[in-house]
Amino acid sequence: MTNIRKSHPLIKIINESFIDLPAPSNISAWWNFGSLLGVCLILQILTGLFLAMHYTSDTATAFSSVTHICRDVNYGWIIRYMHANGASMFFICLFMHIGRGMYYGSYTFSETWNIGILLLFTVMATAFMGYVLPWGQMSFWGATVITNLLSAIPYIGTNLVEWIWGGFSVDKATLTRFFAFHFILPFIIAALAAVHLLFLHETGSNNPSGLTSNSDKIPFHPYYTIKDILGLLLLIMALMLLVLFSPDLLGDPDNYTPANPLNTPPHIKPEWYFLFAYAILRSIPNKLGGVVALVLSILILAVMPLLHTSKQRSMMFRPLSQCLFWLLVADLLTLTWIGGQPVEHPFITIGQLASILYFFTILVLMPISSMIENRFLKW
């Protein structure tokens, strides 16, 4: 009799994905973030489900319902803060996961990479709409500013914005539809993640050396299940430290003031994980130009496989490319800092220089450095 894990139609899929999956023997802790993202998604769906049971998507009661969750619902405060800070953890894992893909050349699996970019856009849209739901000052004005960017699209812009708003300003209709989308999108993300995994398992995982590992594979269970559990424990520990000791560390104080269309906050800014893109948007004086740069700052990931000029896949043995990679990381941290600063001298200039450097590094410096390294190795 064959093992049920290998014969049952459903269990067989799980077995081939998480138990008997052949994995390279040398993948490092940087390969933990995929499973951590799965855990983050499950955590967000569960906490979000319990929040949705008590939340009301009406402009008159949305803010009060969030207050009610924190004050009157049993353990409502911890569910709310786990959901809010869970989003930050989600993005930390996402950025690490993408950085790993860039460093070790995982983008050469083009289908997996492109689904990943689609996932990134979907997660960003979900997080943005979630930020609007508490209906605080920053929720309202963030929604107004970001949706207004679509008015920069020639000819159809204004109609498009009013169609998204469901009226002539961000109001009850906007909040209701944002809640509906915020509820459904995580399930679409889960489906896309399954497709992401499907494409990954067609080729097998990459590894730090960037070389083929077909000659040296080990089963996923128990080796990588135990490794993933360690990563999970560290993630939960970091999240709970944040939630229990400083839950508002990454939030904005303005969001504790109910939304008021007649009073604009002095500095409108999104959550920290969007600040790098927000800084790129603000660094261009023209509205349409800013929106294009904003979209391209993420979409640029799609051209990475085309810009790969090196004869080696990974950056493990390419010191010049490594330096440029860490320059890019430093540049993104600079952009994140600038995005949270007011629009005044010297922040405007720093933001513009950092934005130029971001695109220049990916589009020009990295391909050139790869070609120089090829010459060094006489390839």
UniProtKB/Swiss-Prot annotation:
Pfam families: Cytochrom_B_C (PF00032), Cytochrome_B (PF00033). Binds 2 heme b groups non-covalently. It comes from the Eukaryota. GO terms for biological process: mitochondrial electron transport, ubiquinol to cytochrome c. Its main location: mitochondrion. The chain crosses the membrane at residues 33-53, 77-98, 113-133, 178-198, 226-246, 288-308, 320-340, 347-367. GO terms for cellular component: mitochondrial inner membrane; respiratory chain complex III. Heme b b562 binds at H83, H182. Heme b b566 binds at H97, H196. Keywords: Electron transport, Heme, Iron, Membrane, Metal-binding, Mitochondrion, Mitochondrion inner membrane, Respiratory chain, Transmembrane, Transmembrane helix, Transport, Ubiquinone. InterPro entries: Cyt_b/b6_C (IPR005798), Cyt_b/b6_C_sf (IPR036150), Cyt_b/b6_N (IPR005797), Cytb/b6-like_sf (IPR027387), Cytochrome_b (IPR030689), Cytochrome_b_C_euk/bac (IPR048260), Cytochrome_b_N_euk/bac (IPR048259), Di-haem_cyt_TM (IPR016174). It is found in: Mitochondrion inner membrane. It is a multi-pass membrane protein. Gene3D superfamilies: Cytochrome Bc1 Complex, Chain C. CDD domains: cytochrome_b_C (cd00290), Cytochrome_b_N (cd00284). A ubiquinone binds at H201. The cytochrome bc1 complex contains 11 subunits: 3 respiratory subunits (MT-CYB, CYC1 and UQCRFS1), 2 core proteins (UQCRC1 and UQCRC2) and 6 low-molecular weight proteins (UQCRH/QCR6, UQCRB/QCR7, UQCRQ/QCR8, UQCR10/QCR9, UQCR11/QCR10 and a cleavage product of UQCRFS1). This cytochrome bc1 complex then forms a dimer. Component of the ubiquinol-cytochrome c reductase complex (complex III or cytochrome b-c1 complex) that is part of the mitochondrial respiratory chain. The b-c1 complex mediates electron transfer from ubiquinol to cytochrome c. Contributes to the generation of a proton gradient across the mitochondrial membrane that is then used for ATP synthesis. Heme 1 (or BL or b562) is low-potential and absorbs at about 562 nm, and heme 2 (or BH or b566) is high-potential and absorbs at about 566 nm. Belongs to the cytochrome b family. This is Cytochrome b. It comes from Salanoia concolor (Malagasy brown-tailed mongoose).
